[in-house]
Design a protein with these regions (language model features):
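Short acidic/polar hinge/loop motifs at secondary-structure boundaries
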Residues: 6-36, 40
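Transmembrane beta-barrel outer-membrane domains
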Residues: 20, 43, 76-80, 155-161, ...
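Predominantly transmembrane beta-strands of Gram-negative outer membrane beta-barrel pores used
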Residues: 29-33, 49-57, 61-76, 81-147, ...
Length: 201
């Protein structure tokens, strides 16, 4: 994952259960790179790369003195509430451009039709429950049956994320110099495998 051609140096590089700290809502465009072009971004991109182009550091002088974008989105599967906006402003005729953007997103647990686990996994859970019951572990058997019969919502899949970014750039002819600062704060759940925590000696 890249941001403006630079690797997204975050916890997602160390573990698959960490989300990338990239907000697609306020991105200008997203590039999917494959083939020889990915070698420009180092050996870790051998399988391809995703380059998110944002506007935190303005890349060009805007044609308007002030430009504002506002976005909103919702869905019913997760009861998504999402808002975002960005501002680009030329500071007179000085060659300075200011940018600011922010977003907020919240979702509830994912709503699904039917059972929350796949048929094969549900069969395994019910078989494990029967085995636990035969061995006299009635509480564990009941927990496994509850996990197998769970339906409607996938537990621990809700999220809440907010971002805030600001940047300046100075343009002089064909040259430019810019700096930016951003905050990305996210709380998200990782659904566990039902029945994965039952072990006996």
């Amino acid at each position: 994952m890249l941001i403006d051609g630079i690797g997204a140096i975050d916890a997602s590089n160390t573990s698959d259960d960490h989300a990338v700290s990239i907000d697609a809502l306020t991105a200008e465009r997203i590039e999917v790179l494959r083939g020889p072009a990915v070698l420009l971004f180092g050996s870790q991109a051998i399988g391809g790369a995703v380059n998110v182009i944002d506007k935190r550091i303005p890349l060009r002088l805007p044609s308007e003195s002030v430009h504002v974008d506002v976005l909103a989105r919702s869905d019913t599967a997760t009861d998504l509430r999402e808002f975002g906006g960005s501002l680009d402003a030329r500071l007179g005729n000085s060659g300075f451009v200011f940018h600011a953007d922010g977003s907020w997103r919240e979702t509830d647990d994912l709503e699904v039709a039917g059972f929350t686990v796949a048929p094969e996994l549900r069969a395994d859970l019910l078989a494990d429950a029967a085995e636990e019951e035969e061995e006299g572990h009635l509480e564990e058997a009941e927990e496994l049956r509850e996990a197998a019969d769970q339906r409607g919502f996938v537990p621990n899949t809700g999220t809440e994320t907010w971002t805030a970014n600001a940047g300046f750039a100075f343009f002089a002819g064909e040259s430019s110099l810019g700096v930016s600062f951003g905050v990305y704060d996210s709380e998200y759940g990782i659904p566990g495998r039902p029945g994965g925590g039952h072990h006996h000696d």
